[in-house]
Amino acid sequence: MLLLISPDGVDEALDCAKAAEHLDIVDVKKPDEGSLGANYPWVIREIRAAVPADKPVSATVGDVPYKPGTVAQAALGAAVSGATYIKVGLYGCATPEQAVEVMRGVVRAVKDHRADAFVVASGYADAHRIGCVNPLSLPDIARRSGSDAAMLDTAIKDGTRLFDHVPPDVCAEFVRRAHDCGLLAALAGSVRSGDLGELARIQTDIVGVRGAVCEGGDRTTGRIRPHLVAAFRAEMDRHVREHAAAAAQS
């Protein structure tokens, strides 16, 4: 599993740089603008400069509306600013067809600029609360649009978590569908270290966290700390090893 950590600015990105050996992707977002809140282009550039060159930078485009042209232009802005991974939260898309239209525009915009860009179509485990596309439709949306990964997060940060809305067995189906489509499967949404056993069991490719590596476990008021990143990674790797050993014995 790959570990994606989401600092909210340059200062936290520098702390991520201190823990670079323990993480795989640095994700730029603005938590006070939503689950996948987009940060400023200059912040993406500054974070790209702050973290080691071998660590890819991801940037969220936002919890986006159904406005394909607007979203495509925003996604290109993230790519031009230095992000390799481009994440789009399909917040305002009520149907799979709308979501595919939005993501096709994003894929064309960013891959015309940078062929190796990695596009992530992100939905929400709590989609029923906001009226957007069903979580299990995301892998097919990603496949049809030419995206590289399907992701689930939570839209409303009120203390509920990924597994509160999409139980582990349903997340396993999400991962299976993504893999069947030739995509990576990413899961986030107030993930804690106690969830890592299930995430390893269902063969999640990317785990995204913020609160779990912040002081006090608070994604908004807490700050990312290198020792918390290291501890989370150690626990994640332990579960991956245990799952691999169990699978080899079965």
From Swiss-Prot:
Active site residues of this protein: K29, K87
One Pfam family hit: 4HFCP_synth
Top-level taxon: Bacteria
Single GO molecular function: lyase activity
Alphabetized InterPro entries for the sequence: 4HFCP_synth, RibuloseP-bd_barrel
Known catalytic reactions: 2 D-glyceraldehyde 3-phosphate = 4-(hydroxymethyl)-2-furancarboxaldehyde phosphate + phosphate + 2 H2O
Key words of the record: Lyase, Schiff base
Enzyme class: lyase
Record-listed E.C. numbers: 4.2.3.153
Similarity comment: family membership: Belongs to the MfnB family.
Protein's job: Catalyzes the formation of 4-(hydroxymethyl)-2-furancarboxaldehyde phosphate (4-HFC-P) from two molecules of glyceraldehyde-3-P (GA-3-P).
Protein name as it appears in the record: Putative (5-formylfuran-3-yl)methyl phosphate synthase
Organism: Streptomyces coelicolor (strain ATCC BAA-471 / A3(2) / M145)
